Structures are given as structure tokens and as C-alpha cells.
């Protein structure tokens, strides 16, 4: 249990071996520690194949990148995390997959796997511009609304803006996604672009390119919007996953990465017992908006 707990915190087999020697005074090989952590692989498989609910009001899909050694070559792999908000307003990690081939075909297989595990309907999927995701959603869940992640949208815009302008620029961007309706949001978008485009020529291009996938949010009340664009749930999970990157720069294999991700997930989600704030109101609005698709 102690070994698995240390592995979940992102420690390498060598660090665990050294810690055990320091604390308990006996030597353990890295191979032994690897064998102990391998014992959770069947548990991981069961978790990854467990049945899911039929309906999820909201799903978030996000990617975190890691370096993995593969036959002596270091490759960059993405861990794709799917986080659901269930009908009780509680957060739940549905799936973690490791891959390097983002495409509509890949995403279709991921979404079909959710269907095979019992998911019949999803109201809204929030994701960043993952390659092929929009087409895959349309094929697997034709009634599902695709919403670009506002936090990523803002972050991508501010990436190349120096500190001296970042606060003012971020404040102006807020006028877009806090607008009361789509028309006012579009006017705000044009205003912000006009103000900053001379200084940062391409900063707002993605807003225009992605506008169709940004606009679904404007039909909702502030309560629902907050759930959609406040990505606290996925951000807190990501900070747990990023710790793994800080602990070790390269994972020795795909399996080692998967073990670390699952154990970190089990650790992080133990505390997830509460429903989202104002969930009753949010659920009521979604029930009206998506009539007949949510359980009464």
C-alpha cells in the first residue's frame, strides 16, 4: 500500500526504493517495486471498462503531454482525460487513454468506447481544439453540442502577450464571454480586435475561426455558463497530473505512465463527494433547454 501510494504521488521506482531504505532500513530493487505496482493493472482494466451512466449533462476532454521512452527513443505522448458531470452534478473521471495519433478516427473510437460502456446521450462536450474531435462528436453523438473550452481560448490568446498588457487584455476578453447574448458578444469581439490587433496582429484570429464552437454558451444563464467555462474540475485534476511531470522528466514505458495516471486519479478523486454549486438550478435549465433528454 505504501509503495503504491508513493507511486501515485509520481515518485520513480528508484526514489521509492531509496525512501524505503531510508525509512525502514532494508533494500528493495526497482524491479520488485515495478512488480508491486503491476499488481494494480487488472484493477485499472476493470476501472477503464466499468459501466457508465446512460446520460451525462456535460463532459470535458483535455490533454496533458508526457515524455515516454520507447525502444531507447523518447516520444511525446498525450494522456487524454475525459471528465463527466453526472445527473447528480458530481464529477467523475470516465476514461484516460494514452496516444499520439489525434484524429477524427481516434476520437471516434474513444467516443464509441463510451457508448459500449452504456453512455447513450451527452448534452454538451467541452474540449479544446483537439484535431478531429468535432467531426467525431457529430458522428458518435449527433445531438451533442460541441463547446470550445473558453479557458483554453483565453490562454491561447494571452500566450504571446507580455505581462505589461496581459491584465488589460484578459479583462477585455472577459467582455466577450460574459456578454448577455451572442450579438453583444460579437460586437465585443470586434471591439477587442480593433483595440489590440495593431499591437498583436494575430491574437484574435482564433476567436473568429472558432466562433461557431464558442457561441453555444451564450444561450445559457450565468449559473450554467459558470459550470461550462469554469474548468476548476479539470484544472485541479490537471495540477495533479502535472506533478507527475515535475517528479520525473521521462517515463520508462506507456504502462508506467498509465499506472501513474490511474493511481494519481484514484488519489485525487477520493475527495469528490459534493455536487456542483447551484446544481438544482443548472439541471432545471438544462432540462428545459434539452427537453426530454435528462431524467426527471
Where are these regions (language model features)?
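Short, amphipathic alpha-helical "recognition" segments used to contact nucleic acids or chromatin
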Residues: 1-10
